[in-house]
Regions:
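Short glycine-rich or small-residue beta-strand-to-loop segments that form or flank ligand, phosphate
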Residues: 9-11
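Short hydrophobic/aromatic beta-strand micro-patches
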Residues: 13, 57-59
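Short, surface-exposed ligand-recognition loops at beta-strand->loop->(often short) alpha-helix junctions
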Residues: 13-24
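An amphipathic, aromatic/His-enriched active-site/gating alpha helix that lines ligand/cofactor pockets
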Residues: 23-41, 59-96
Length: 108
């Protein structure tokens, strides 16, 4: 875990049949991203009103970390293909950066 406890969080819903997006993340996208240096996790609601909601969390060192993301995530043909595929399966995407309140130096 990085010292600052910062995470980029995206929440979204699936546009595809139940289980398809989950399998894509587990079998293809998460292993690829991790091989490229990302510390990334995906959570999905188990019980909720309405469609299942996904939470994609990616640990970041600082705000400048975003500068290297395009090359890490899409710098290879396989990465571009995976990103194009996942974007087509997602809807209602929202993103933010959060920080662990228990780390030193938290705040705005």
């Amino acid at each position: 875990m990085m010292q600052d406890g910062m995470w980029h969080v995206e929440t979204f819903e699936s546009k595809v049949e139940p289980g398809v997006l989950e399998a894509f993340f587990k079998d293809e996208l998460l292993p690829y991203w991790r091989s490229r240096g990302f510390n990334v996790k995906v959570f999905v609601t188990q019980y909720s009103l309405g469609p299942a909601q996904f939470w994609l969390l990616t640990e970041i060192e600082n705000m400048a970390s975003f500068d290297s993301w395009p090359e890490l995530a899409e710098g290879e043909p396989r990465g571009r293909d995976l990103m194009n595929r996942v974007v087509r399966m997602m809807e209602n995407v929202r993103g933010s950066v959060v920080r662990d309140l228990e780390t030193t130096g938290h705040g705005r």
